[in-house]
Regions:
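Propeptide-to-catalytic entry region of secreted or membrane-anchored zinc metalloproteases
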Residues: 1-79, 112
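Solvent-exposed loop/turn segments at secondary-structure junctions
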Residues: 37-41, 95-99, 115-117, 135-136, ...
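Catalytic zinc-binding patch centered on the HExxH motif and its immediate surroundings
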Residues: 42-45, 74-111
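Short pre-active-site segment immediately N-terminal to the catalytic Zn-binding motif
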Residues: 2-5, 100-125
Length: 286
């Protein structure tokens, strides 16, 4: 299946380089593709009784999340990666079930045959490449909620303890209030219905096409809700981020790190990504 891997890799890399700031900085990247042979095709998904002997041990259901794809076999992963010079790694897994994962400074993953692989590839690479936080908060995550709202280290979320010291204040749009109002209640009501149906699809082990249809409907509804407010497209501090509906804020109403909508990285995320590109392409600032 080497030819399939090459087609998938070229397709997904081209999508990454269609997004800013990668689009403008494509010349600063070298991309290598490695296609190690596996004993069996496909990827493990223990929650549905599927187990595969893959070369690097990638699997769904990481940390109990059915969509979270990781490998815990670091030695095998590093053995494969050592055949090319690398700073960043994206692992393509041979599956069509929605899923992926991204860990800052380690690797990111995506199910290459999923309808949503273009989005997941870019979103998860944002985690891996620049330590971007998840801005969504209405779907289940593999992490426990926090009792305290400490200021996160990630560049694109804040606890907004002191609006005057907002970490992205240099990008703040003029005359934008903090916190910044948006159609939060309407968004959450819609999301609750979607998440209920999402869980039922997985519990009933229904075809992946039904999940794809649900996500497509969600995308239409969310695009209708977002993007039409007074502060849509503005940089502010919109409550709801990092798996929490209260107490954490994101820079813009919508972003690749928030929804599957047809939107770019927000300006704060773009700035964070650009800093990492500069670090590797130009060296540290003196």
């Amino acid at each position: 299946q080497r030819s399939k891997f090459e087609k998938d890799a070229r397709r997904l890399v081209s999508i990454l380089f269609s997004k800013s700031p990668f689009k403008e900085r494509k010349q600063d990247f070298n991309v290598w593709g490695l296609c190690p042979e596996s004993r069996e095709p496909g990827i493990s998904r223990p929650s549905t009784g599927i187990h595969r002997r893959s070369r690097i041990g990638a699997t769904y259901d990481a940390f109990g999340s059915e969509r979270y794809v990781l490998t815990f076999d670091n030695r095998s992963f590093r053995d494969v990666a050592s055949f090319a010079p690398y700073e960043f790694v994206e692992i393509l897994v041979n599956g069509n079930t929605y899923g992926g994962g991204g860990i800052f400074g380690l690797y990111s993953t995506v199910a290459a045959d999923s309808l949503w692989s273009p989005y997941v590839f870019v979103h998860e690479f944002g985690h891996h490449f620049a330590g971007l936080a998840d801005e969504y908060y209405t779907s289940d995550s593999a992490y426990l909620p926090t009792a305290d709202r400490l200021e996160p280290w990630e560049p694109n979320v804040t606890a907004l303890k002191d609006p005057k010291q907002l970490k992205w204040k240099a990008l703040l749009s003029p005359d934008t209030p903090l916190p910044t109002p948006w159609r939060k209640d309407e968004f959450e009501a819609d999301s609750r219905a979607i998440q209920t149906e999402r869980k039922k699809i997985r519990a009933d082990r229904r075809p992946e096409s039904e999940m794809d249809a649900l996500f497509t409907r969600e995308k239409t509804e969310v695009s209708r809700i977002l993007g039409t407010d007074q502060y849509s497209g503005k940089v502010g501090a919109f409550e709801g981020a990092m798996y929490e509906p209260r107490g954490y804020f994101r820079p813009e109403e919508d972003c690749i790190m928030f929804t599957r909508d047809e939107v770019p990285f927000c300006r704060v995320c773009q700035a964070a990504l650009s800093r990492i590109i500069d670090l590797y392409a130009r060296g540290p600032e003196k």
